[in-house]
Amino acid sequence: DLIGKDAIKLRDGKQVTEFQEGILPWALRNPCAIVFDEYDAGRADVMFVIQRVLEADGKLTLLDQNEVIHPHPSFRLFATSNTVGLGDTTGLYHGTQQINQGQMDRWSLVATLNYLSHDAETAIVLSKAPTYNTAEGRRTVSQMVTVADLTRTAFMNGDLSTVMSPRTVIAWAQNALIFRNTGYAFRLTFLNKCDELERQ
């Protein structure tokens, strides 16, 4: 649980109910960072709890415990989101919702991260599939990343409804090793996820 919950514990041989602190109160008290991944897929009731922590003073009130937690000076809160809080307008991120403007306004910094450079993505794929770290293998991985770049351009132009992520390129490289066939691995890793008309 994010805030905490009542839990049954043994004390002096007897069962007692005690509040067990959740991850958010614990993190607030300590010099640490907490990261909420896929933040825009969170439930509204959870979002409103986090919204209180995003205020300028960042206090969290535990009403049932009659306690106000002030954040540690080095506490930090981060979140990741594919939709930047705008909701899913493309149909690619089903299950996400638009984050209300009051919530978005409380995030003091928002950074947008686009795809990596060709060379950086190639290096990551090579680190995940080190078998390719030969002259021929590096050329193959570079060509795979070029194909991924082409799918991203086609997606932005509205020509494709599916995009190739770095995760997909890594899977393609690994599957090509398993099947010993780059084309067949491409079909299984990416092409079969595309709309039938787009496959042609």
Regions found by a protein language model. Give the residues of each.
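C-terminal regulatory/interaction module of P-loop NTP-utilizing enzymes
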Residues: D1-Q200
